[in-house]
Amino acid sequence: MLHKLLAIAQAEIGIREEGGNNRGTRIRQYQRATDLPPGPWPWCAAFVSFCVQQWLIENDVPEWLRLTRSPAQWQPRTALAYGFRQWAKDRTRTTSIYTDKDPAQPGDIVTFDFSHVGIVLEDAGDHLVTVEGNTNGKGERDSETGDGVWRKIRPKSLARNFIRIHPAR
């Protein structure tokens, strides 16, 4: 089922801000997936929240997760990269938190030490292949110069946590 989440995230690769400064029609859609009003704020977490929300629209996903509440109550709405950890802690039946020392799996949400978040495509040993919003196509560590949704390769040492979504236990 996580392949559908990966497909949603990967379909966004290439979306760019319009005029910089965290602006643009699609960027506003990402930001509306959070509890904050759209504005000139970093949107990496909004991108991940948006992707998970779109994934939940798929008819078979809530059933696969075995949700006991509505998808709208389960979905993330955080605009903070580190907010995903609390989101996962509040959903221990359907999420697990792993450290940066654990292997990542495709579909994991990865939080980075520099207050950034993305979706894991692959754990390549000492590097992660991810899809991230509010980043750039350069090899830079942070997202201060972010301008779009990109496929990134980052050192795994920059990861803080992996949040794995799974069927209810």
Where are the regions that the model predicts?
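N-terminal capping segments
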Residues: 1-69
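Sequence-level motif detector for i,i+2 pairs with an aromatic at +2
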Residues: 3-4, 125, 160
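Intrinsic disorder/low-complexity signature
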Residues: 14, 18-19, 105, 131-133, ...
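Glycine-rich catalytic cores of cysteine/serine-nucleophile enzymes that process amide/ester linkages
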Residues: 25-39, 111-154
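...with weaker cross-activation on analogous glycine-rich loops/strands in unrelated enzymes
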Residues: 58-138
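Low-complexity, Gly/Ser/Thr/Pro-rich intrinsically disordered linker/tail segments
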Residues: 146-169
